[in-house]
Regions:
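Accessible peptide chain termini
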Residues: 1-2, 397
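N-terminal export and membrane-targeting signals
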Residues: 2-16
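Bacterial N-terminal signal peptides
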Residues: 13-25
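C-terminal region of N-terminal signal peptides and the immediate post-cleavage residues
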Residues: 22-38
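Residue-level hotspots at or immediately adjacent to binding/recognition sites across diverse folds
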Residues: 33-397
């Protein structure tokens, strides 16, 4: 369960049924150090480097625009206090594939950013929860992260849903997913006019209810403005994980009945790409639980048919979970870990084999995004990390 993705005032309502009870950010802060030499620490301004160490384990999403050299990472900023005494956030920007970074403490002070999506080198969107009401919020930049405009509709102040993830396939079309209220039911919202109006979908697939709800959505990936795959599950349940898809802009939705989702509590993130022949290939990252010990195990599932059927391609018995996944191609993916010292896991052969990168800290909510098959950016282990050689993976022959 992504406890830290839920507004802090709402955690207590569901924590009693949680299966993942790992506390984020309580480990003693440490200087960043990943295993190996293929991921290098970004040279950040002292205020941001210090913030990543002293305020470790928070929401630190990263988004790169494929085919460019542009990425944005949202990081804590201890010199930017908001909401009285809370540590604020800043946007770190690179326009040279991670070689240099510039920080901008211009995010709205009215809400805590949980998720980020960049559609172009100029247009990015963030979503999160407001300090005032705990309701959903959204902001946009049109100058590559230098300045941000709060575009939260007034009627969201008491909205009965939250946004855990956002994906913007175009500069004006964005999709957000999360839960509805305290009952763990799914929510999906969409704008097609740059945030002027938003549609809350009421036609999502239903499943039998439990005392703690049906399922919530944690991640979404869209290969076009109309074609998206969203993933999630029931926090505190025993599975199956849930995957819903649309190919017509949300007019209709399909619920995957794949057997591979059974026993998987939740998928936390998903990355989809167009595949040869016109289909869609997706990789979903999440968590299952060992049948003998009950400990959490991070895993990756793959789908070759637009999210309809899935097969497990990776599992790590590390008492943690994969929090984020990014695929530059249908063969090259990196997943970022949480709740363990497995910081990253990557494949260059479509999931047949994986390489892991460990950290010297635990309880990280890792995030990763790839510019290309060779260049990716990760926020994990109290730092921003960059690889320019696909993390040292040997390309598949």
């Amino acid at each position: 369960m992504r406890l830290t993705k839920r507004p802090s005032w709402a955690v207590g309502a569901l924590a009693a049924g949680a299966s993942i009870a790992i506390t984020i950010g309580l480990a003693t802060p440490a200087r960043a150090a990943l295993s190996g030499s293929d991921w290098t620490a970004a040279n950040l301004a002292p205020r941001y480097a210090k913030s990543l160490v002293e305020d470790a384990g928070g929401h630190e999403p990263v988004s790169c625009v494929a085919g460019t050299q542009f990425c944005v990472a949202i990081v804590p900023d201890i010199k930017n206090l908001v909401n009285g005494s809370s540590i604020g956030q800043a946007a770190l920007i690179t326009r040279d594939a991670g070689r240099t970074w510039t920080g901008h403490a211009t995010l709205p002070s009215t809400f805590l950013v949980d998720a980020l999506s960049c559609a172009t080198k100029n247009v990015c969107w963030v979503t999160g929860t407001t300090w005032a009401t705990g309701g959903p919020a959204v902001a946009e930049t049109i100058d590559g992260g230098k300045t941000w405009t709060d575009k939260t509709p007034a009627d969201w102040a008491n909205a009965p849903w939250w946004a855990f993830a956002i994906d913007c396939p175009t500069a004006t079309t964005c999709w957000m997913v999360g839960p509805t209220g305290f009952s763990q039911d799914p929510s999906v919202e969409k704008t097609t006019d740059g945030g002027a109006t938003w549609t809350l979908f009421g036609n999502l697939p239903t499943v039998p209810s439990t005392p703690i709800g049906t399922y919530e959505l944690n991640g979404i990936s869209c290969v076009s403005a109309d074609s998206c795959v969203a993933v999630g599950g029931l926090n505190g349940g025993s599975g199956p994980a849930r995957v819903i898809t649309t190919t017509d802009g949300g007019a209709t939705w399909s619920l995957s009945a794949s057997a591979a989702l059974s026993g998987v509590q939740q998928l936390m993130d998903v990355s989809c790409l167009p595949a040869a022949g016109g289909g869609t290939t997706c990789y979903g990252a999440g968590v299952t639980f060992a049948s003998d010990t009950g400990t959490a195990e991070s895993l990756v599932l793959a789908s070759q048919d637009d999210g309809a059927t899935w097969a497990q391609v990776e599992s790590l018995a590390d008492n943690g979970w994969f929090n984020s996944i990014s695929c530059a191609s249908t063969r090259n993916c990196w997943a970022a870990g949480a709740g363990s010292d497995d910081a990253l896991a990557g494949t260059s052969d479509g999931g047949s084999s994986w390489s892991t990168v460990t950290s010297d800290t635990t309880n990280e909510l890792g995030s990763v995004s790839c510019l290309s098959g060779s260049t990716c950016v990760a926020v994990t282990d109290n730092g921003v990390w960059v690889t320019s050689d696909d993390g040292g993976l040997t390309p598949a022959s």
